[in-house]
Amino acid sequence: MSEADARPSNFIRQIIDKDLADGKHTSVHTRFPPEPNGYLHIGHAKSICLNFGIAQDYQGQCNLRFDDTNPEKEDIEYVESIKKDVNWLGFEWDGEVCYSSNYFDKLYEYAIELINKGLAYVDELSPEQIREYRGTLTAPGKPSPYRDRPIEENLALFEKMRAGEFEEGKACLRAKIDMGSSFMVMRDPVIYRVRFATHHQTGDKWCIYPMYDFTHCISDALEGITHSICTLEFMDNRRLYDWVLDNITIDCRPHQYEFSRLNLEYTVMSKRKLNQLVTEKLVDGWDDPRMPTVSGLRRRGFTSASIREFCKRIGVTKQENMIEFGSLESCIRDDLNENAPRAMAVLDPVKIVIENFEEGAVETLTVANHPNKPEMGEREVPFTREVWIEREDFREEANKKYKRLVLGKEVRLRGAYVIKAERIEKDAEGNITTIFCTYDAETLGKNPADGRKVKGVIHWVSADKALPAEIRLYDRLFTVPNPAAADDFAATINPESLVILNGFVEPSLAASEAEKGYQFERMGYFCADSKDSSADNLVFNRTVGLRDTWAKIENQ
């Protein structure tokens, strides 16, 4: 299979193939243009993979450009976070990071050009009046009384706007297009407004700032973008995109293409709703492992490869649809099953005492880090007289389907010996506190000599040598597939989206690298928390379970 055949295929790539074949373009230049007013989420990751992936596959270029035209809501913190996320996802932008603010002087000149052509005017209607005059989807707008000002007057007023002689909301520059258009975006849109705000890149140089729709298309053209790719909600805006470029003097003529945004079950993507979750402390910040932000997914233990694979699997279309959350979980589960080293951890411990094992003795066992990858090596696991096992791995009585430890019967401890439960000890409430066992010293790495069958295998850790750890069991943040459709989306938060347990982990995990995935055998995939875990206070986050338990619930 050739490299071209191995590429993903979608309608955008088909357009690019045709453009190159027809000679419309000789190379491909895309961009990823976030506004630095928040943290990236997995919906942005889809756009990142699309734009940077196209540039990679066509040996082209992809810019990282910050659409920074709204200084009141933007911050350098978001700039740095976005750069980190793009790099973490596995991509490098071409050249220096771009900012729309780099082009403020040129944008101002293009606004002057539109005024000189009679295609823009200074409007002194209030923002409320502008909305009223714009009309509705069923009623045309009506022209502003300032629409037909002479060009010279508009130039003078626009210069006064720049000089700070108008208060905010008292004047704006509008494109002069068509107040009767069936497309609201074409009814004389505002292209400049007054804002007395310090900008994180330009400081206090400007007190007028261009609007997104005016800025975006010109920035694309100035950077030589060939294919400007955005989501479907900007489809109507393409008319304004084209109008601006058709009416200014500029060499490059990019074209805008739209694809469907990512809608993922059991979460929300709206910046407003995500912000509500954070400000109302319904989650623990933007990087809470339950959040769909790139930083939250990273902290939970998702790998960049798994997110790229997810974006590849869901594809690029114009059809709006809801993607199953299980599809995302499947990608990280496949990745970690293949690449994560194994370790043992007991989340809900009950003690076992092996009565015929020497008291105080420590036997060092050697266990493979991965059952199918010998190249991942081995680790040492201490075995002692007292060990912890999962409480759910023992029953006083059980049927034949129960393949774990039962009173009077045997089970194998993973990587160690066969043990037999002889008797138990309970507290005053009837809870089992200790299981007394014996072990078969001849069963390390082999079956019992007399041929008896021992089918069950359970995990364990040494009670003497294991390390205490806080285990955070993360799950889906909402109880319904589409929380955004609920009257009160916050009321659908899953009360069990975070369950905290105090367990024990094997000592090899003492120096666990933050966010590195492990399979805790039989329990799921986990990683050390990047903010709270330390050598003295181990904290592990569950990334995903070994299997999709929600699928069973949804199918009931």
Curated annotation (Swiss-Prot):
InterPro entries: aa-tRNA-synth_I_CS, Gln-tRNA-synth, Gln/Glu-tRNA_Ligase, Gln_tRNA_ligase_bac, Glu/Gln-tRNA-synth, Glu/Gln-tRNA-synth_Ib_cat-dom, Glu/Gln-tRNA-synth_Ib_codon-bd, Glu_tRNA_lig_a-bdl. It holds the Pfam family tRNA-synt_1c_C. Keywords: Aminoacyl-tRNA synthetase, ATP-binding, Cytoplasm, Ligase, Nucleotide-binding, Protein biosynthesis. L-glutamine binds at D67, Y212. The keyword S-adenosyl-L-methionine does not apply. A motif ('HIGH' region) lies at residues 34-44. Its EC number is 6.1.1.18. Gene3D superfamilies: Glutamyl-trna Synthetase, Domain 2 (1.10.1160.10), Glutamyl-tRNA Synthetase, Domain 3 (3.90.800.10), HUPs (3.40.50.620), Ribosomal Protein L25, Chain P (2.40.240.10). PROSITE patterns: AA_TRNA_LIGASE_I (PS00178). It is found in: Cytoplasm. The keyword Protein biosynthesis applies. It catalyses: tRNA(Gln) + L-glutamine + ATP = L-glutaminyl-tRNA(Gln) + AMP + diphosphate. ATP binds at residues 35-37, 41-47, 231, 261-262, 269-271. One of its GO terms (biological process) is glutaminyl-tRNA aminoacylation. GO terms for molecular function: ATP binding; glutamine-tRNA ligase activity. GO terms for cellular component: cytosol. A motif ('KMSKS' region) lies at residues 268-272. Belongs to the class-I aminoacyl-tRNA synthetase family. Monomer. This is Glutamine--tRNA ligase. It comes from Vibrio campbellii (strain ATCC BAA-1116). The gene is glnS.
